[in-house]
Amino acid sequence: MERTVFLNGDFMPEGEAKVPIFDRGLLFADSVYEGFGILDSQIVDYEYHMNRLDRSLGELDMPWPMSRDDLLVAMMTLIEANKAVEGFLYLQVTRGSRDRSYLYDDDYQPTVFAFT
């Protein structure tokens, strides 16, 4: 059975999730990630991890891909969809996709994906 994953606001079977080859996360590792423990279908130390994600995004001058509240709803929906009682949730945010260039501006639309 395929897992449900989250990509840019949508939930889908893992086999349908596609990230463009020109995404800066792939080309330049221009991304941040955070790992969340899951226990009793709840996120362990949620605030700690979200604060660390905030710090990491800030260090790379990357915007949040969505509000913290919306991200929490997405993560909890993902946990429920995959019936994850104990485990791990991986979340990654990239600067986004555009033609390959070392330079970037504030116009990028971040890519966000997560899976359990």
List the model feature ranges, each with a label:
Residues M1-T116:
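Conserved alpha/beta cores of soluble small-molecule-handling proteins
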